[in-house]
Amino acid sequence: MKSSKNDTFVYRTWFKTLVVYFVMFVMSAVVPITAMFPNLGYPCYFNALVDYGALNLTNYNLAHHLTPTLYLEPPEMFVYITLVFIADCVAFIYYACGEVALIKARKKVSGLTDLSAWVSAVGSPTVLFLAILKLWSIQVFIQVLSYKHVFLSAFVYFLHFLASVLHACACVTRFSPVWVVKAQDNSIPQDTFLWWVVFYLKPIVTNLYLGCLALETLVFSLSVFLALGNSFYFMVGDMVLGAVNLFLVLPIFWYILTEVWLASFLRHNFGFYCGMFIASIILILPLVRYEAVFVSAKLHTTVAINVAIIPILCSVAMLIRICRIFKSMRQGTDYVPVSETVELELESEPRPRPSRTPSPGRNRRRSSTSSSSSRSTRRQRPVSTQALISSVLPMTTDSEEEIFP
């Protein structure tokens, strides 16, 4: 069966967007690599943004000078860029497999809207557009960092973080109700390559994106307070404490969003929790390296406690997610349509008829006109009753009488 014109248009749009995504992926892979080597057009090494040798938490920011605050050092920035690149590589393989799977599955289209449902299951054009926006914004972020523009880099990374949040939600929910997602998944032919891509490879890619979102939450928190610390007359220690507290609060909203909304679509979404553990390790490294600086500013205990709360909250949220998974497995509240045999049994049940007994005090003497009218009604009553029964009850055949005696 051929797909509808609407589905064909959706598939062509998705394919063109996928080509743009592949081109943007190549560019996003080239930019970080070339930015690490000198004499290739980048003025500075983007990983080394601040000099922690001059870190002083009791000083205020200096005008016309980059004041060092809490940020990622070159090893941590390299780990972050590498993990994001690995996730993008896996997503590149996933979309390539998805295109091949859709080409093979088009031969098994059985409905007018099957093709658009399969495209949405793999990744709608909206999801691809958000992925392209992510790849573009991370390139701009690296280029801006190489020029040491911390204010512009914070704004660009805010756009990147917003695109990452929307992209993660789109990958999990497809921005559709649960029943629409279930209907799209049920339309996929079983034991096919498309089935393997959607139900096995896509959850892996989605969890990788969620893990990268946790790392991006850390970089976003540090970027915001790096820009604030170099824009206003604030103490450096306050900016460090503010960055840690922002990274402590933002994941709580995601934990709530996961249990309220995202868990209905993807139960095994542990990628964000794993990313939070990695981000906590990255955040605690400056506290260990520059312990003397934090101790001299009397912020070591406060920052250490706040940083320690982050993995504790993550562990609690992860434990809640595991408990809810086991609870849903025990309940087994998957609803299925009512079978046709149950409907036939309900229709074949005999219906009780009301008994018609004359009242004891009724007057038996009637006039001739009333008696004649009553005789006519008695003659017409069986006909009307038969018509009523035939109009309400289903017509039974010999085979049905044998099944339902």
Curated annotation (Swiss-Prot):
GO-annotated cellular components: host cell endosome membrane; host cell Golgi apparatus; host cell nuclear inner membrane; membrane; viral envelope; virion membrane
Region (Disordered) location: 346-405
Compositional bias segments (type: Polar residues): 386-397
Topological region Intravirion: 1-17, 98-121, 171-192, 267, 321-405
Virion surface side: 39-76, 143-149, 216-245, 289-299
Topology relative to the membrane: Multi-pass membrane protein
Membrane-spanning intervals of the chain: 18-38, 77-97, 122-142, 150-170, 193-215, 246-266, 268-288, 300-320
Disulfide bond among keywords: yes
Alphabetically ordered keywords of this record: Disulfide bond, Glycoprotein, Host endosome, Host Golgi apparatus, Host membrane, Host nucleus, Membrane, Transmembrane, Transmembrane helix, Viral envelope protein, Virion
Assembly information from the UniProt record: Interacts (via N-terminus) with gN (via N-terminus). The gM-gN heterodimer forms the gCII complex.
Function: Envelope glycoprotein important for virion assembly and egress. Plays a role in the correct incorporation of gH-gL into virion membrane. Directs the glycoprotein N (gN) to the host trans-Golgi network.
Protein's name in the database: Envelope glycoprotein M
